[in-house]
């Protein structure tokens, strides 16, 4: 019975069953060539042409080039449209202004602008040209409140008109 099954599978119905063995198997090897043709990659030696540094850059900002601590007065609080009701909130705002002012001391000479963090992908910027015509009035009709052809955004937690505190 086994003999007849082998004859059935070796028949012309399955011509791919009798494919020729690869050359390295014909030589009596067990399934793999003696030496691999693939090379190992040393991942530490890979260098990519990238604007993004391979290691984090921690610039040292000296205390002389950064501005001194800017005091937050009532006018600054009013412009922020956020009511600072405690001394801790005042300190937090002063700390944020001091932290943000460090950007003034960063030297950006010779640094190309980065349009996208995915610099290996192609970024096609469209031309800046008007394509829809003059639709300013149509857009402004969607606004709840407008002032001199501008949208009026809702204020923060402080009213725009304030009575002076006594």
Curated annotation (Swiss-Prot):
SUPFAM superfamilies: Glu-tRNAGln amidotransferase C subunit. It is found in: Mitochondrion. Its EC number is 6.3.5.-. GO terms for biological process: glutaminyl-tRNAGln biosynthesis via transamidation; mitochondrial translation; regulation of translational fidelity. Keywords: ATP-binding, Ligase, Mitochondrion, Nucleotide-binding, Protein biosynthesis. One of its GO terms (cellular component) is mitochondrion. InterPro entries: Asp/Glu-ADT_sf_sub_c, GatC. It is an enzyme of class 6 (ligase). It catalyses: L-glutamyl-tRNA(Gln) + L-glutamine + ATP + H2O = L-glutaminyl-tRNA(Gln) + L-glutamate + ADP + phosphate + H(+). GO terms for molecular function: ATP binding; glutaminyl-tRNA synthase (glutamine-hydrolyzing) activity. Its main location: mitochondrion. Transmembrane segments: none annotated. Pfam families: GatC. Allows the formation of correctly charged Gln-tRNA(Gln) through the transamidation of misacylated Glu-tRNA(Gln) in the mitochondria. The reaction takes place in the presence of glutamine and ATP through an activated gamma-phospho-Glu-tRNA(Gln). HAMAP family: GatC. Subunit of the heterotrimeric GatCAB amidotransferase (AdT) complex, composed of A, B and C subunits. This protein may be expected to contain an N-terminal transit peptide but none has been predicted. Belongs to the GatC family. This is Glutamyl-tRNA(Gln) amidotransferase subunit C-2, mitochondrial.
